[in-house]
């Protein structure tokens, strides 16, 4: 609904074209607990023909406690390739002036260690027929030792999605641990498909 109102989506695109997130970074100044009441707002950044930034803000008790920066691209769902708004039949609205820091770009680590594998079940895929974005953080966070979560929370999360992962594919999971930072990489058949970087910060309840 939001995409239609802002001019970035229309019903004729259904099943033909869709947006996928390529990079995102989340910064939190404090943890969010179960039953916390939070408010989410969003705004669109200055876009190009193929890159569409979007920013999200998290407020709790009238205080801004978090911000998410994301980059989206429009793809042809049948060809599985990036496409232009014009090809999708879109006439985009006036380009906003908002320019902010982009999500962090992550790179493969030389000293990464293979720690596990994960076979993607059917229940993990979305309507685009690839591993749903919500599962990447779950898969990555499960590789962090339980002890790391004691008196710590994730205050910084960055994810780079490099190549789609399909149902039943086997992901080789690599971990690099540097102080309070954990970098998790997922490879399929020797090709890097995603990188997740998580920083843990100490807190007291």
Feature names for model-found ranges:
Residues 1-37, 144, 203-205:
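Hydrophobic, proline/glycine-rich low-complexity stretches
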Residues 23, 117, 156-158:
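Extracellular/lumenal ectodomain signal focusing on beta-strand-rich modules
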Residues 23, 27-28, 32-110, 165-168, ...:
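HotDog/MaoC-like acyl-thioester-processing domains
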Residues 120-142:
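A conserved, well-ordered hydrophobic junction motif at loop->secondary-structure transitions
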Residues 112-122:
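Short amphipathic
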Residues 30, 118-120, 163:
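Extracellular and analogous surface-interaction loops
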Residues 147-176:
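A conserved acidic, glycine/proline-rich C-terminal tail/linker
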Residues 16-17, 35-37, 54-55, 150, ...:
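Short, positively charged
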């Amino acid at each position: 609904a939001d995409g239609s109102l802002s001019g970035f989506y229309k019903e004729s695109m259904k099943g033909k074209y869709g947006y996928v997130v390529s990079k995102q970074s989340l910064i939190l100044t404090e943890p969010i607990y179960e039953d916390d009441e939070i408010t989410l707002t969003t705004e669109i950044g200055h876009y190009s023909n193929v890159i569409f930034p979007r920013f999200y803000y998290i407020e709790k008790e009238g205080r801004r406690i978090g911000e998410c920066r994301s980059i989206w691209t429009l793809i042809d769902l049948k060809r599985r390739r990036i496409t232009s708004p014009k090809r999708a039949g879109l006439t985009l609205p006036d380009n906003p002036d908002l320019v902010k820091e982009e999500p962090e770009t992550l790179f493969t680590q030389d000293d990464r260690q293979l720690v596990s594998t994960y076979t993607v079940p059917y229940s993990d895929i979305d309507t685009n027929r690839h591993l749903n974005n919500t599962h990447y953080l779950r898969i990555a966070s499960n590789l962090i030792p339980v002890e790391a979560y004691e008196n710590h929370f994730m205050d910084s999360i960055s994810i780079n999605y490099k190549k789609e992962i399909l149902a039943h594919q086997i992901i080789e999971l690599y971990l690099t641990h540097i102080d309070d930072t954990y970098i998790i990489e997922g490879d399929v058949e020797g090709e890097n498909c995603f990188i997740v970087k998580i920083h843990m910060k100490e807190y007291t309840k």
